[in-house]
Amino acid sequence: MKFLFVLSALASLAAAQSVVIQAPAPGTTFAPGQQFVVDVDRPDTITGSQDVSVAIGLLSCVGQAPPGTCDGVNTTEEIGTVLFAGPYTPQLRPGGADLFQNFTVSVPDGFQAGAAALSVAHFTLVGELAMPVLEVITETVFVS
Ligand SMILES: *[C@@H]1O[C@H](CO)[C@@H](O)[C@H](O)[C@H]1NC(C)=O
Ligand SMILES: *[C@@H]1O[C@H](CO)[C@@H](O)[C@H](O)[C@H]1NC(C)=O
């Protein structure tokens, strides 16, 4: 019983550490070679958690999903071309209540035109027990 409680408490704790892609907006169109900022946000929670790293990937959905969509593409299995992989050390947003970090990345030259899944894989250690949590969040963007 107690164990179950601890597990569910950890699960909600883990959910509270979840990141969001603040920018770019879903549906944004980029040209191959174009630079853009991926703004990775998380709430400034009082519960202890230690962010470790993120990986940002871009996966073409062309031929894997109905045209113009990424429906059914599972980015927990692959994030595609890795645009960034390294430490995640978010800072308090000026004038805001959340933590953020901007990553400047570029669409690879010659990237397949069409819908693409932009993913952020986020690795964090949650709570006093340092429970390792890996989450992958994704949005659909377009490459022209
Ligand atoms: C995505 O893939 C993972 C790992 O294979 C699997 O656990 C999960 O159920 C899949 N999700 C969907 C929506 O298919
Ligand atoms: C981070 O990126 C967002 C979205 O592009 C932008 O509004 C903000 O000014 C950037 N912040 C910094 C400090 O570069």
PLM features: what roles do these ranges have?
Residues 18, 51-53, 138:
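Exposed beta-strand and adjacent loop surfaces of beta-rich binding modules
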Residues 141-143:
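Interdomain boundary/hinge segments at the C-termini of tandem beta-sandwich modules
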Residues 35, 43-92, 121-122, 133-134:
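Contiguous segments within soluble domain cores/interaction surfaces
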Residues 21-26, 85-90, 102-106, 137:
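Short structured motifs
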Residues 17, 47-49, 111-113:
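A cross-taxa feature marking solvent-exposed loop/turn segments within ectodomains of secreted
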Residues 1-20:
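Fungal secretory targeting signals
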Residues 15-41:
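N-terminal edge beta-strand
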Residues 99-139:
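Internal, hydrophobic beta-strand segments that form the core of beta-sheet-rich folds
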